[in-house]
């Protein structure tokens, strides 16, 4: 149940983009993402220029997401609307065939997780990313998920490259197979209520 396609898409909305935790996506979430991304990129330092750039990116992203997913045009994208948009625009497709808004989502997420900026998401960064969304009694739970997610080649390379991350993210939101390795992209999942 936790790795079902339905739950994975709910998870993306709830834990990745509904920053203000009101149960839906709206313009405010993307304004908050601009602040968050600026601070993450600056490793805690706030650059007005970087913020202005992130504001522009996030405003454009919200406008594109609203165009793709706000079917009733009320200024809010519900979980159901987001699921419909994913089904319509992403399901069964590779990353390269996704709409621009989804690609920006994915690139920004990679940038936020790649804390050391080496172009790879290693086990240490994966652990840090996982604990920002869920509680774990043992680190082994996270490590086991990382090992299910990654291949031997990924681990030899020092982690997931951007290209590999893009492919896994595309599978996470578009592949209905509950046993695909991409199900572990954001760690051990819980059922989203």
From Swiss-Prot:
It comes from the Eukaryota. Disulfide bonds: none annotated. The keyword Calcium applies. Ca(2+) 1 binds at residues 18, 20, 22, 29. SMART domains: EFh (SM00054). Gene3D superfamilies: EF-hand. Expressed in tail muscle (at protein level). GO terms for molecular function: calcium ion binding. Ca(2+) 2 binds at residues 70, 72, 74, 76, 81. Residues 16-40, 57-92, 101-136 form the EF-hand domain. Residues 10-36, 49-72, 130-147 are annotated as: IgE-binding epitope. Pfam families: EF-hand_5, EF-hand_7. Keywords: Allergen, Calcium, Metal-binding, Muscle protein, Repeat. Ca(2+) 3 binds at residues 114, 116, 118, 120, 125. The keyword Calcium applies. Like parvalbumins, SCPs seem to be more abundant in fast contracting muscles, but no functional relationship can be established from this distribution. SCPs from crayfish, lobster, and shrimp are polymorphic dimers; three isotypes (alpha-alpha, alpha-beta, and beta-beta) have been identified. The sarcoplasmic calcium-binding proteins are abundant in the muscle of arthropods, mollusks, annelids, and protochordates. This is Sarcoplasmic calcium-binding protein, alpha chain. It comes from Penaeus vannamei.
């Amino acid at each position: 149940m936790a790795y079902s396609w339905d739950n994975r898409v709910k998870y993306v909305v709830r834990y990745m983009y509904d920053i203000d935790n009101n149960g839906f996506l709206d313009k405010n979430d993307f304004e908050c993402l601009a602040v968050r991304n600026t601070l993450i990129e600056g490793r805690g330092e706030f650059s007005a220029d970087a913020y202005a750039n992130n504001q522009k990116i996030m405003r454009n992203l919200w406008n594109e997401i609203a165009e793709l997913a706000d079917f009733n045009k009320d200024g809010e994208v519900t979980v159901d609307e987001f699921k419909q948009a994913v089904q319509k625009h992403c399901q069964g497709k590779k990353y390269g065939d996704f709409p621009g808004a989804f690609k920006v989502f994915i690139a920004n997420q990679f940038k936020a997780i790649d804390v050391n900026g080496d172009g790879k998401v290693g086990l240490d960064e994966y652990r840090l990313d996982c604990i920002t969304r869920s509680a774990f009694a043992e680190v082994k739970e996270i490590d086991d998920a990382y090992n299910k997610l990654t291949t031997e080649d990924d681990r030899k390379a020092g982690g997931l490259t951007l290209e590999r991350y893009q492919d896994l993210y595309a599978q996470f939101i578009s592949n209905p197979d509950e046993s695909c390795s991409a199900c572990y992209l954001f760690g051990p999942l819980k059922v989203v209520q």
